[in-house]
Amino acid sequence: MVPCLQVCKAKACSAIEVQIALESLSTTIYNNEEWTLRDTCEELWLTEPKKCFKKEGQHIEVWFDGSKNNCMQYVAWKYIYYNGDCGWQKVCSGVDYRGIYYVHDGHKTYYTDFEQEAKKFGCKNIWEVHMENESIYCPDSVSSTCRYNVSPVETVNEYNTHKTTTTTSTSVGNQDAAVSHRPGKRPRLRESEFDSSRESHAKCVTTHTHISDTDNTDSRSRSINNNNHPGDKTTPVVHLKGEPNRLKCCRYRFQKYKTLFVDVTSTYHWTSTDNKNYSIITIIYKDETQRNSFLSHVKIPVVYRLVWDK
């Protein structure tokens, strides 16, 4: 069967367009790079971002409605070659909570918009981005008042160490606390060349906190008692500190793991601190075993970092 005239004309025009682009690219410094037939084929030329040459794609998984069973795969390219105002340029893809983009003549250009994809494949306008060992959670899934510059969530673990560790009574904001590191390997975090805003420093700790029975009305003298006294009842907790909308998103996700904790607070902040841009949520456990199970099974956006409110 012979294709119709319109189809033949469209294919011929596309082939000529690719040929002209390759001839133009061959006059640049990029002609010394290794190029394969796949790198220069028409199919890849018309793949997003269109009318650009692309190399070394990395698959990105997006989970819609927070479900791994409702996921789609997209591609972020290590190298993108586009013909801009200053001739041919070589850039790489970037990934953030909004989508996949590249910088075209100084402008961030998204070629995959996760919000639009969520409308097609999801119902709750919630999505998670997963690539290799990194994940991005969209703050828009819990609040319409989110800011575009989202700080990473830091896990704040205020703990009482095991019996073999010496602990001290700690006044929040005034003294340092004695903590013990959890045995085992420290979680690994690979810095992504796509999005420097997700850089973090890893420091893994485990503890549990005993809150003093006497509560001073002066917030500056409020203290957390970590001394191991016979008969004292301790409650294992984990504190997460970060940007409020991001914390709400984490708290929403934790509902899938209700059997791994007793309760979780709403977002709050200490009245004694001047920094109101960060909030805290506290997760309470019935014992250390449950807490350890929670930390083993629940994926938190960034690795644990010890932070004391000042």
UniProtKB/Swiss-Prot annotation:
Any single biological process term in GO: viral DNA genome replication
Listed InterPro entries: E2/EBNA1_C_sf, Nucleotide-bd_a/b_plait_sf, Papillomavirus_E2_C, PPV_E2_N, Reg_prot_E2, Regulatory_protein_E2_N, Regulatory_protein_E2_N_2
Site of covalent link Glycyl lysine isopeptide (Lys-Gly) (interchain with G-Cter in SUMO): K241
Annotated stretches, region: Disordered: 159-239
Subcellular location: Host nucleus
GO cellular component, one term: host cell nucleus
Key words, A-Z: Activator, DNA replication, DNA-binding, Early protein, Host nucleus, Isopeptide bond, Phosphoprotein, Repressor, Transcription, Transcription regulation, Ubl conjugation
Segments crossing the lipid bilayer: none
Residue span of region Transactivation domain: 1-143
Keyword Ubl conjugation (UniProt): yes
Top-level taxon in the UniProt lineage: Viruses
UniProt feature, compositional bias: Basic and acidic residues: 189-202, 210-221
Post-translational modification remark: Phosphorylated. Sumoylation plays a regulatory role in E2 transcriptional activity.
Ranges where the record places region DNA-binding domain: 234-310
Function as written in the Swiss-Prot or TrEMBL entry: Plays a role in the initiation of viral DNA replication. A dimer of E2 interacts with a dimer of E1 in order to improve specificity of E1 DNA binding activity. Once the complex recognizes and binds DNA at specific sites, the E2 dimer is removed from DNA. E2 also regulates viral transcription through binding to the E2RE response element (5'-ACCNNNNNNGGT-3') present in multiple copies in the regulatory regions of the viral genome. Activates or represses transcription depending on E2RE's position with regards to proximal promoter elements including the TATA-box.
Assembly and oligomerization: Binds DNA as homodimer. Interacts with protein E1; this interaction greatly increases E1 DNA-binding activity. Interacts with protein L1; this interaction enhances E2-dependent replication and transcription activation. Interacts with protein L2; this interaction inhibits E2 transcriptional activity but not DNA replication function E2. Interacts with protein E7; this interaction inhibits E7 oncogenic activity. Interacts with host TAF1; this interaction modulates E2-dependent transcriptional regulation. Interacts with host BRD4; this interaction mediates E2 transcriptional activation function.
Record-stated family: Belongs to the papillomaviridae E2 protein family.
The protein's name: Regulatory protein E2
Organism: Human papillomavirus 56
